[in-house]
């Protein structure tokens, strides 16, 4: 899988990584993960909150309540648990950086995208609140909209779209690296990855 490929790439340059599989619906595991990070490294230099589920594309009035609950749970509630668990480790770092990954759906009011759009709008609001709360620390929190990207989720949402017309995740990654760098002093802002990279 992709994580194993990343691990191989890291090893190829002489570094090492610890791969941890985690179900974002398992909220209780996040404090344990934070404790393990603290025990091994004592800090967290960067966090990218990218986990998401699309849910079902259907009118709000037809939506299965379980789909609503799951989408909000993974896309918003789990991210709050992540913030709660990881904030002390990020603040312990000399230049902790956090990125919350949003979507154009947070602003587009796309019909049939109800729980996904609502969860991403909520994520952006939470990111701004978190940035305000950490203003006086070394932590920098920002939000990024990658834009349409050739991912599995995009293929599910737009099955007729040619993925070759979209940037790959690798093409978008430099925008994330900018916001994760020690030099980044932006805080509490929403960035459009394509604009950052001139795509």
Regions found by a protein language model. Give the residues of each.
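The beta1-alpha1 cofactor-binding region of Rossmann-like NAD(H)/NADP(H)-dependent oxidoreductases
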Residues: 20-32, 65
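Conserved catalytic-site loops of classical short-chain dehydrogenases/reductases
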Residues: 45-46, 69, 96-101, 139-142
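Catalytic loop of short-chain dehydrogenase/reductase
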Residues: 53, 91, 97-122, 127-136, ...
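Substrate-binding pocket helix/loop in short-chain dehydrogenase/reductase
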Residues: 58-60, 64-69
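C-terminal helical subdomain
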Residues: 136-139, 143-144, 151, 160-199
